[in-house]
Design a protein with these regions (language model features):
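Ligand-site clamp/hinge motif
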Residues: 228-234, 258-305, 458
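Extracytoplasmic/peripheral linker and loop segments enriched in polar/acidic and small residues
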Residues: 48, 53, 353, 458-470, ...
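Gly/Pro-rich hinge or "lid" segments in bacterial periplasmic/extracellular proteins
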Residues: 206-264, 271
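Append "and occasionally in soluble cytosolic enzymes with long acidic Gly/Pro-rich linkers
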Residues: 343-450, 592
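N-terminal lobe/hinge region of extracytoplasmic solute-binding protein
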Residues: 61-115
Length: 593
C-alpha cells in the first residue's frame, strides 16, 4: 500500500476531533492537554450540599438519558442491563452494604464467613419485610440459588461461582431436588457450604454469594422457565427497598410510592417519577429544569450543561470501561462453555494488536468526551486499587507499528486497491458491530473505520448501520455470524475476579476466547493465595499482561459518572460505601426547581 499522510476529522456536538491517521512523524498518537472545556474530575462531590429540611409530599423527578427503551426486567436474578438496574433502584435493595474497599458488610442481612469450614452464613435482620408486608425469610434467601441453579433457568448467572456451591451441579443436572450445600438454620438464616472459599465472596458481588433475596411466595405456581416474563418480574415486583413500583409505562417510565413496610424508616418523598430522555433532548431539558436528577448526561456535551444554574454536579470514576471485542468462537449451550475457534477471521493476535495500535483513544477521551473519559490501559478498572496495574502501557496509537504487525503476519495488499488481503491472499473484510445511541456513536464509528483504513484494513459496519442497543446485545450474545468485532462496554460491579466476564464457562465472555493459560490465570484469582493482598496484586498483574498481549479485548476508555442534581434535592449520596439505598434519605426542600 502506498504510504500517505492523512488527517481524519470527526465533528461531534460542536467539537472537532483531529487525529493523525498515518504516515511520517504523525504515526504516534499524542496526549491531548487539558483546556477550559475539559473536566476537572477532582472537583466533583459525592453528596448533595443542601441541608435544608425536606418538605412533605414531595415528588422527585429523574431523567434517565437513553436512546433505547429499558427492558423492564425487575429482578436481580434475570436482569442483565444497567438500564433496568437504574429503573429498579428506588425499589430494590441489596442484602449487604459495601465498605470503602468494595467489600461486603452487614446491611439488611448479616453475613459471616468461615474460611476453614468453607461456609457463609446469611441472617436476615429483624423487621425487614417485603412490600406486601410479609417477612423476608430463609426461604427467600435460598430461593434465588434454586432458580439460578435450575436447568430451566433462562438467565445468565449460572456460572463457575454457582457451581462452587456443594451440591449445585447435582441439582442443576436433575440428580437432586435440593442443593445439598445450602441448609436453612432457622426461619431467618441459611448456611452455604462451598467446595472452595474465594476472595470474590468478600466483595459485594455475585461470586457465589448472591447479594439479593427473592420473594418465593410471589412465584408460587410459576415455572422457572416462565419466570423472566412473569408478572412478579415484569408488572408488580415485590421488593424491600424504600419505595415500591406503582406504575410502569413500558420502556418509558416508572413511578414509585413509599414502601410502608420499609425497615429503614419512612421515606421522605410521596412519589418518584423516573423517565427515559433522548440524548438529543438532554441538554435542553436540563436548561429548562425539567428533572431533579439527570442520569447519563452525554459527556460529549459537557461544556453545554456543566455550568447550568440550579444544579450541582456529583461524580466519581465509574467501575466500568468501554472496549472493542473480537468474535473468536461460539457458545456451546449444551456443555455450558465457550469454544474457541483457532480458524476464525480474527484469530491472529497480530491482527487484533494492529487494530488496537491504529486508534487514538487518548484523543477520543479528551476531545470527544471533554475529559470525562480517560484512555483505558487494562481490563481491570482503577477502582480496584492494588489489583489494577497502573504501569501497564496498554495500547497507544502507533500507526507504523500497526502496519508492521500486519506486514509481518502476512496481511498484505496484493491487488493494489489500498486494502490488505488475508494471509491466504483472499479478500479481507471485517464486519464491525457498533451500538446506536448518543450524539457521538455515528462519528466515533466513522473515526474507527477511517483509522483502520489508514493501516489498510477494510472494516465495514455489520448490518450496514449502527445497531439498536437491545438488538446489538442479542446479536453479540448469540454469536451472530455477521459480526467479526464489536464495540461495547462493561459495568464491572465490585468484584475484580474476571471469571464471570472472560472465563471458559462465562456466557458474558462474548469474545468466546479460551486458552489454557487464560483459564489458569483466572482460576488463580479465586485461589487461597488471592486472599493475600500482595499475592493477589501479582496474580492480577500477570493476567492483565497476558490479556493485553492476547488482545482478545481492547479496553478503550474508562469513564467518570457525573450526575447533575437540582439544588432543591437533599440527602442524595452516591458514595459506594453508603449504608443505605441511595433513595432512602432523599427529599426535596422546595416546591419548585
Amino acid at each position: 500500500m502506498k504510504k500517505k499522510a492523512l488527517l481524519g476529522l470527526v465533528t461531534v456536538a460542536g467539537l472537532t476531533l483531529t487525529l493523525a491517521a498515518c504516515g511520517g512523524n504523525s504515526s504516534k498518537g499524542t496526549s491531548s492537554s487539558s483546556d477550559s472545556a475539559t473536566a476537572d474530575t477532582g472537583d466533583f462531590k459525592l453528596k448533595t450540599t443542601n441541608t435544608k429540611e425536606a418538605i412533605k409530599d414531595g415528588t422527585l423527578e429523574i431523567g434517565v438519558v437513553s436512546d433505547t427503551a429499558f427492558t423492564g426486567i425487575f429482578s436481580d436474578a434475570f436482569k442483565d442491563g444497567t438500564l433496568d438496574t437504574t429503573f429498579f433502584s428506588p425499589a430494590n435493595e441489596a442484602l449487604f452494604n459495601t465498605d470503602k474497599d468494595l467489600k461486603m458488610t452487614d446491611g439488611a442481612a448479616k453475613i459471616k464467613f468461615d474460611e476453614d469450614a468453607k461456609t457463609v452464613t446469611i441472617t436476615m435482620t429483624d423487621g425487614v419485610k417485603w412490600s406486601d408486608g410479609k417477612d423476608v425469610n430463609a426461604d427467600d434467601l435460598e430461593f434465588p440459588y434454586l432458580v439460578i441453579g435450575n436447568k430451566d433457568y433462562t438467565g445468565v448467572r449460572y456460572d463457575s461461582s454457582m457451581k462452587n456451591i456443594v451440591g449445585m451441579e447435582d441439582y442443576h443436572d436433575g440428580k437432586a431436588d435440593t442443593i445439598s450445600g445450602i441448609k436453612k438454620v432457622n426461619d431467618k438464616e441459611i448456611q452455604i457450604t462451598y467446595k472452595e472459599m474465594t476472595p470474590s465472596m468478600l466483595q459485594n458481588a455475585s461470586s457465589g454469594v448472591l447479594g439479593y433475596a427473592m420473594p418465593k411466595h410471589t412465584f408460587d405456581g410459576i415455572a422457572i422457565k416462565d419466570m423472566a416474563s412473569s408478572d412478579p418480574v415484569r408488572k408488580n415486583p415485590v421488593t424491600f427497598g424504600p419505595y415500591v413500583i406503582s406504575k410502569i409505562t413500558a420502556g418509558e417510565s416508572v413511578e414509585f410510592t413509599p414502601n410502608k413496610y420499609y425497615y429503614g424508616g419512612t421515606p421522605k418523598l410521596s412519589k418518584i417519577v423516573m423517565k427515559t430522555l433522548p440524548t438529543s433532548s438532554a441538554t435542553a431539558s436540563m436548561k429548562s429544569k425539567e428533572f431533579d436528577i439527570y442520569e447519563g448526561m452525554p459527556s460529549s456535551e459537557y461544556t453545554s450543561w456543566k455550568d447550568l444554574s440550579g444544579y450541582e454536579l456529583l461524580g466519581q470514576q465509574a467501575t466500568s470501561y468501554n472496549y472493542i471485542g473480537f468474535k473468536l468462537g461460539k457458545w456451546d449451550s449444551e456443555k455450558g462453555v465457550n469454544v474457541y475457534d483457532s480458524s476464525s477471521k480474527m484469530a491472529d493476535k497480530s491482527l487484533r494488536q494492529a487494530i488496537a495500535y491504529a486508534i487514538d483513544n487518548e484523543a477520543i477521551a479528551q476531545k470527544l468526551y471533554n475529559g470525562l473519559q480517560t484512555r483505558a490501559n487494562s481490563l481491570i478498572v482503577p477502582a480496584f486499587g492494588t489489583k489494577y496495574d497502573a504501569d501497564l502501557k496498554g495500547y497507544t496509537q502507533d500507526v507504523e507499528k500497526a502496519k508492521k504487525l500486519l506486514d509481518d503476519a502476512g496481511y498484505k495488499d496484493t491487488d493494489g486497491d489500498g486494502y490488505r488481503e488475508d494471509k491466504n491472499g483472499k479478500k479481507l473484510e471485517i464486519n464491525f458491530a457498533f451500538r446506536d445511541g448518543g450524539t457521538t456513536a455515528k462519528s466515533l464509528a466513522e473515526y474507527y473505520i477511517q483509522a483502520w483504513k489508514e493501516v489498510g484494513l477494510d472494516v465495514q459496519l455489520a448490518t450496514g448501520r449502527l445497531i439498536e442497543v437491545n438488538s446489538f446485545y442479542d446479536k453479540v450474545q448469540n454469536d451472530d455470524p455477521s459480526i467479526d468485532m464489536y464495540q461495547a462496554g462493561w459495568s464491572t460491579g465490585y468484584d475484580p475476579d474476571q471469571s464471570g466476564l472472560y472465563g471458559e464457562d462465562a456466557q458474558f465472555n462474548f469474545t468466546r476466547f479460551v486458552s489454557d493459560e487464560n483459564t489458569k490465570l483466572i482460576k488463580e484469582m479465586s485461589s487461597k493465595d488471592a486472599f493475600d493482598d500482595e499475592k493477589a496484586a501479582k496474580i492480577y498483574k500477570e493476567w492483565q499482561e497476558y490479556a493485553n498481549d492476547q488482545a482478545f479485548v481492547i479496553p478503550t476508555t474508562y469513564s467518570f459518572d457525573v450526575t447533575p442534581v437540582s439544588d432543591r434535592v437533599t440527602g442524595y449520596d452516591i458514595s459506594r460505601d453508603v449504608d443505605h439505598n441511595v433513595f432512602a434519605e432523599v427529599g426535596i426542600t422546595s416546591e419548585n426547581r
